[in-house]
């Protein structure tokens, strides 16, 4: 008797299994898998130093969890309703807008992503340009590149009317929706898995409709297009309105109406956070407050620092930036400029042809890392300076940190990683550990062995 019950249950379960249910189950599992960790990844000590939170990236993970539960429910109890399909389409579009919300509502994250990407790119160019000297260990002949000004967190200021033309679609995707390579460099694979999970789930929902599937798909897309147009229009308005007000404030500033500029700028920065990382906007606000006799001391110090920075007076610039940062520790733009001003001092010491001072330069690069942890150019420059100064153990420690930080990016920088492994090879050679030195040297020229684990002695 029990055997018959088991067989009947098995037959019933077999009859319930079909392609649609299997695909819905796979889609649900993919959605659950995408929520295993944060959708954006940056070094934790950098986030702490800048006072940055990945709240949006963490809360966004609730979306695939909810839709994964819905998918499991529909896997067991099949529901054929247009509302369900449109609900999953909406979930997919919300997930696709993750870069927009992450970039626009946490501009400090955009600032860090832009700067880490550009710093790594400049280091790569320096390595490629000096490759022959680097491989030959002629560090004394290498000059370090001056860093560019910190990249802003605001990319969507409209420069002219071409923004409204069809040809500006790429700019809309890159600057408004934040579909930019610098942002994607540090995005987690979980975001792509979530998109895949929604796509699989939607495929499963249309699968059992046989010859009606394409008709239903066309009808659903037709129902979604008006709503999609509304969403895109709202996104455009969210960019156009701040730009219109921004340029209107330029006119008010030119007329000397500083009170209006000061009050409206503060309101605009609250409603449109990316402006908090735009140096022109903040400098204008500082000057308006100063002339209105209601100065924001932190912004005035920032403006003075920017003026000295443009004149390449790095020490005075550092003083003003430090004063501004002391008053507003979470001002990420000030922190970025402060790090750049200190870095330029170290590079000047290192590049001085008549009196190269690698030890002083190294100490200066260390100061950069206390302001801007994991600053790629500062770590690379510090690694070189320590090697030039004969401090191969300290150089190797920085190399290890560079290697560890590459795990946060989607695609490690080959030139930078190659140099880090080369410095570890030199440490092994100086320690007379020739086997380890050879293994590290192989890693510096062959990316296929990067994942080989080699323990370093303390």
Model-derived features: positions:
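Internal/C-terminal transmembrane anchor helices
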Residues: 90-100, 216-244
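TPR alpha-solenoid repeat register
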Residues: 277-281, 300, 334, 378, ...
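Cytosolic-side transmembrane helix boundary signature
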Residues: 68-84, 196-229
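Hydrophobic alpha-helical transmembrane segments in integral membrane proteins
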Residues: 101-114, 234-259
């Amino acid at each position: 008797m029990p055997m018959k019950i088991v067989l009947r249950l098995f037959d019933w379960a077999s009859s319930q299994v079909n392609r649609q249910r299997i695909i819905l189950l796979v889609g649900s599992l993919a959605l659950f898998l995408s929520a295993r960790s944060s959708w954006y990844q940056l070094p934790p000590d950098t986030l702490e130093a800048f006072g940055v939170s990945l709240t949006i990236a963490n809360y966004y993970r609730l979306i695939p969890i909810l839709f994964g539960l819905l998918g499991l429910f529909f896997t067991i109890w099949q529901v054929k309703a247009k509302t369900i399909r449109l609900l999953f389409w909406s979930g997919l579009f919300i997930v696709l807008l993750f870069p927009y919300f992450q970039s626009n509502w946490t501009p400090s994250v955009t600032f860090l992503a832009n700067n880490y990407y550009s710093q790594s790119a400049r280091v790569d160019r320096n390595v490629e340009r000096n490759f022959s000297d680097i491989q030959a260990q002629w560090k004394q002949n290498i000059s370090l590149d001056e860093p560019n000004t910190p990249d802003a967190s605001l990319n969507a200021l409209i420069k002219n009317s071409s923004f409204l033309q069809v040809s500006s679609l790429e700019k809309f995707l890159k600057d408004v929706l934040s579909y930019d390579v610098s942002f994607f460099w540090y995005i987690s694979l979980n975001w792509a898995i979530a998109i895949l999970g929604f796509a699989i789930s939607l495929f499963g929902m249309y699968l059992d409709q046989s010859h009606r599937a394409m008709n239903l798909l066309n009808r659903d897309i037709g129902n979604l297009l008006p709503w999609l147009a509304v969403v895109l229009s709202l996104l455009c308005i969210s960019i156009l309105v701040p730009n219109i007000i921004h340029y209107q404030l330029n006119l008010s500033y030119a007329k000397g109406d500083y009170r209006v500029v000061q009050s409206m700028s503060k309101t605009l920065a609250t409603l449109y956070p990316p402006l908090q990382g735009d140096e022109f906007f903040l400098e204008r606000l500082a000057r308006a407050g100063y002339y209105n006799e209601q100065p924001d001391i932190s912004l005035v110090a920032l403006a003075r620092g920017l003026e000295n920075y443009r004149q390449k007076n790095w020490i005075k610039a550092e003083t003003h930036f430090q004063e501004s940062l002391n008053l507003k520790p979470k001002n990420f733009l000030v922190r970025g400029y402060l790090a750049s001003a200190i870095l330029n001092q170290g590079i000047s010491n290192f590049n001085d042809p008549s009196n190269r001072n690698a030890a002083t330069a190294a100490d200066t690069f260390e100061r950069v890392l206390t302001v801007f942890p994991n600053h790629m150019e500062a770590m690379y420059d510090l690694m070189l300076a320590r090697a030039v100064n004969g401090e191969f153990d300290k150089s190797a420690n920085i190399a290890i940190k560079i290697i560890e930080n590459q795990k946060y990016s989607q695609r490690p920088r080959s030139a930078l990683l190659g140099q880090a492994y080369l410095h570890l090879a030199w440490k092994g050679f100086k320690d007379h550990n020739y086997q380890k030195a050879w293994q590290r040297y192989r890693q510096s020229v062959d990316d296929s062995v990067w994942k080989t684990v080699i323990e370093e002695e303390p």
